[in-house]
C-alpha cells in the first residue's frame, strides 16, 4: 500500500502516567490534529465534577448538585456536569439561579441532553431538543442566555452518515452560541 503525498493518517495516541494528572491534562489530541472547521469562539478546556458516575440518577437535584459545585470550587476545577433529569429534578425555571450560584463559586456548568430522534427510545430527559434544528437552536440560545458553558449530548443511534451529520450540526449550532460540547 502507498500514500500519496502530502498525505495524512488518523492519529492514535496512548497517554500513560504514574497518576491521573498526565492523563486528564494531556493536550496531545489538540496538538496533533488540525481542526476540521474553524470556530467562532475560543474555548477553555478544564476539569470537572460529575455526580452521576457515583450517585446515579438520584443525585440530579438542586442540593446535591450544589455540593458538586462546592467540590469543584474547593478543588479548583472549572466545570460541573449535571446529567439527565436536570430538567425535571432541578427544573428549567430554577436553572438560572443554580448557574448564578455556580458562577459565584467561579464554576461553570455543562448540562446533559439526549440526542433524541426516532432511533432513541430512552426515557431520561431532556429529550427532543437536539435532533430538530429549529428546536436545538432555540434551546442553545436559552442555554447561552442563562450562562451554561456547555452540553453533553448522549445516546446516539450508531455511526451512520445521518448520525455523523447530526454530530456536526450540533457542534456547529453550539459554536454559534459559544457552547462547548461533550459527546
Enumerate the predicted regions with their spans:
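Aromatic- and carboxylate-enriched substrate-binding clefts and catalytic-loop regions
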Residues: 83-183
Amino acid at each position: 500500500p502507498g500514500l500519496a503525498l502530502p498525505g495524512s493518517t488518523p492519529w492514535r495516541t496512548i497517554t500513560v502516567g504514574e497518576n491521573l494528572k498526565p492523563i486528564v491534562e494531556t493536550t496531545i489530541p489538540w496538538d496533533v490534529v488540525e481542526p476540521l472547521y474553524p470556530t467562532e469562539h475560543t474555548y477553555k478546556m478544564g476539569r470537572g465534577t460529575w455526580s452521576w458516575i457515583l450517585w446515579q440518577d438520584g443525585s440530579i437535584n438542586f442540593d446535591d448538585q450544589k455540593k458538586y459545585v462546592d467540590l469543584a470550587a474547593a478543588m479548583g476545577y472549572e466545570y460541573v456536569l449535571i446529567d439527565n433529569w436536570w430538567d425535571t429534578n432541578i427544573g428549567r425555571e430554577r436553572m438560572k439561579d443554580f448557574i448564578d450560584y455556580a458562577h459565584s463559586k467561579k464554576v461553570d456548568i455543562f448540562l446533559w441532553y439526549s440526542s433524541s430522534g426516532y432511533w432513541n427510545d430512552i426515557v431520561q430527559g431532556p429529550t427532543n431538543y437536539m435532533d430538530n434544528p429549529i428546536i436545538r437552536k432555540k434551546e442553545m440560545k436559552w442555554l447561552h442566555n442563562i450562562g451554561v458553558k456547555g452540553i453533553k449530548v448522549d445516546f446516539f443511534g450508531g455511526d451512520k452518515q445521518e448520525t455523523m451529520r447530526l454530530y456536526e450540526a450540533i457542534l456547529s449550532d453550539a459554536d454559534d452560541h459559544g457552547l462547548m460540547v461533550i459527546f
